[in-house]
Amino acid sequence: MGSIEPPNASSCLVYQTITEFADFPDHDQKLWWHSTAPMFAEMLKVAGYDIHSRYKALGLYQKFIIPFLGVYPTKTNDRWLSILTRYGTPFELSLNCTHSVVRYTFEPINAATGSLKDPFNTHAIWDALDTLIPLQKGIDLEFFAHLKRDLTVNDQDTAYLLEKKKVGGQIRTQNKLALDLKGGEFVLKAYIYPALKSLATGKPVQELMFDSVHRLSHQYPTLAAPLRKLEEYVHSRGTSSTASPRLISCDLCDPRQSRIKIYLLELNVSLESMEDLWTLGGRRNDTQTLAGLEMIRELWDLINLPTGILSYPEPYLKLGEVPNEQLPLMANYTLHHDDPMPEPQVYFTTFGMNDGRVTDGLATFFRRHGYTHMLQTYRDSLRAYYPHVDHDTVNYLHAYISFSYRKGSPYLSVYLQSFETGDWPISSFGAPILEPVSKKMCRGHPVSFEVPLTKQQVVASE
């Protein structure tokens, strides 16, 4: 009997087929495709998207998103560092495991990003939106335009920050986009980080964010009640609170349906802190909240996050650097038009933890709660995304696990390292060769993460 082939995302037919016919305007775009598309294609398949939706999603990604990812990251090149990942890479895939929804987030980057024309990447997002709006009905920018005007730097702010040399090691990302893939359609979301605006104006991030949403609630009064509740909770934590507002997001749809989400960073990594975030300090105590709380306690035991007071680490990790760090907790609160109470979502920050143990914890959760498909596929899919890493020791694949509880059902998502996937480490992309070995390949860059790589493996891959 022949041996069973181990799972490998580079074998995904949709990825291979698009590769045959795709036109890449430059070398960087080709590298981005072969680094990320195997995992993307495999994730869509595992999540149960039909073949037409998979081709459409990957085709859109190849043609319209990759051009906004900038130069392909290597250990030596000069590139824009994005807050999206600890390695500064501007693209991340995530999977809602309980409802089988794939999403990806990216920070739009263009030729002006980081230059004197746009030193803080304020404007590239508009070019990306101009590209995406014709592709999906119903995109509306009203909430985004309001928040962006209030919370990202304008030309005057930019000149001030440059003149006073205010921005040293400060994280420079100001905005990013996410696409939730629903069948053959997508739902677009935007995220804004006001840290640079705070630096330019001298106003705290918390004040900037809440004031902006307050002004928005004058036009949309249904946002006022949940905003007041959230603001009350944040203020009740006091001036020495370990939790603070960090970013804000909105749906790019009809403002009457668009949700505002306000994110808090919690430096005290403990179950007690997560319980406080989930219940808004005891303000949420309904049956659904308490049912979700029991699952949070279960996940806490299964994932076993190390506890302690943690700051967000600086600077970025170098490509290929194995993390020796842990991130603070995070939570977001959705302001719904029809609910006076903010809806919480909490984040288990698993980056830096052993991915095998994280996977074991998730598998136990899937088994206990009847998510049979995920139980049967999750471990193999992770191995397919990264077939050349040691899954017993690797500790940088799971960045976050998010949890919320709605309408009697858990919503659990994983946010995963999405870089150098599939056969990248042993292909002509990962191995330093001078010329392409086929029309599918191109001159390679050194692989970022160390993997066992023998001459025989390279020859076999050719």
Curated annotation (Swiss-Prot):
Assigned keywords, A-Z: Alkaloid metabolism, Transferase
List of residues binding L-tryptophan: I83, L84, E92, Y193, R246
Recorded metabolic or biological pathway in which this protein acts: Alkaloid biosynthesis; ergot alkaloid biosynthesis
Enzyme class: transferase
Phylogenetic lineage: Eukaryota, Fungi, Dikarya, Ascomycota, Pezizomycotina
One example GO MF annotation: tryptophan dimethylallyltransferase activity
Subunit structure: Homodimer.
Region forming the signal peptide: none
NCBIfam families named in the record: arom_pren_DMATS (TIGR03429)
Alphabetical list of InterPro entries matching this protein: Aro_prenylTrfase, Aro_prenylTrfase_DMATS, DMATS-type_fun
Reactions this protein catalyses: L-tryptophan + dimethylallyl diphosphate = 4-(3-methylbut-2-enyl)-L-tryptophan + diphosphate
Protein purpose: Tryptophan dimethylallyltransferase; part of the gene cluster that mediates the biosynthesis of isofumigaclavines, fungal ergot alkaloids. The tryptophan dimethylallyltransferase ifgA catalyzes the first step of ergot alkaloid biosynthesis by condensing dimethylallyl diphosphate (DMAP) and tryptophan to form 4-dimethylallyl-L-tryptophan. The second step is catalyzed by the methyltransferase ifgB that methylates 4-dimethylallyl-L-tryptophan in the presence of S-adenosyl-L-methionine, resulting in the formation of N-methyl-dimethylallyl-L-tryptophan.
KW Kinase (keyword) present: no
Phenotypic effect of disruption: Does not affect the production of roquefortine C but impairs the production of isofumigaclavines A and B.
Record GO biological process: indole alkaloid biosynthetic process
Binding, substrate: R103, K189, Y191, R259, K261, Y263, Q345, Y347
Keyword Nucleotide-binding: no
Protein name per UniProt: Tryptophan dimethylallyltransferase ifgA
Listed Pfam families: Trp_DMAT (PF11991)
UniProt record similarity statement: Belongs to the tryptophan dimethylallyltransferase family.
Residue stretches in coiled coil: none
